Amino acid sequence: MTKTSEIAHLFRTLKAPAAARATPKLAERARSEDWSHERFLEAVLSAEVASRESHGGESRIKAARFPARKTLEEFDFTFQRSVRRTVVEHLGQLDFLHSRENVVMLGPPGTGKTHLAIALGIRACLAGQRVSFATATEWVAKLGEAKRHGGLEAELRRLSFVPLIVVDEVGYIPFDPEAANLMFSLVSARYERASMIVTSNKPFSGWGEIFGDEVTATAMIDRLVHHAEILSLKGDSYRLRDKDLGSPPPVDIG
């Protein structure tokens, strides 16, 4: 067994398969480029760390339960001109997450809110952060179930340790008073403790109608936006960009 093969075998014994796979090529390169021992060791260990981070990121993406896979690089800024690329790229650096701030995206259906929310969530997963994604209706259902079993406080406490949760589609279905209170509890429990990304098809002025109570809506908005980046997306639906909705089909009168 050559020394290179022996090193690769030892890495496999240590359950470092990526390092084992990388060793032969890196050893050859190290010899040809006259690397120091330290540089060679760093390169091999970096290969293992990168592999583990990638696999860990995939596990976190799966656990987050995103409805689709989206990236910031795929976002069509030529179609959606109401949001600046520089703002989105800055959000993609995840400073808001480390500062425990929020991101709120408002705009009509189809303008890219969910795409951006998912993409930022996936970026966070790949950066080593746990994320949980659900629609507003799904969050209310989860919290309602916890409350019925006497575990609401425990569930809110558990969620407070998740660095980022995404609440999608606030406003598509109005909340009854209990649902509104549950959503308020979620926002309050995370206030200045952990980040949220919230998307809504309604402007803040319409949230009183969503939650059935102006006081609750105002208190919730206050907590969400106190430390937040707010994106207002405008324009037509991206999903309908190639659809001709202006002309009715011809009527056969023969």
Regions found by a protein language model. Name each.
Residues 5, 9-12, 21-24, 42-43, ...:
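Solvent-exposed alpha-helical segments within well-ordered globular domains of core cellular machineries
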Residues 8, 12, 16-67:
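Interdomain "pre-motor" coupling segment immediately N-terminal to P-loop NTPase/helicase cores
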Residues 16-19, 49-50, 96, 164, ...:
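Generic structural signal for secondary-structure transition and capping sites
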Residues 42-95, 99-102, 234, 238-248:
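AAA+ P-loop ATPase motor domain of ring mechanoenzymes
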Residues 83-161, 208-210:
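Conserved P-loop
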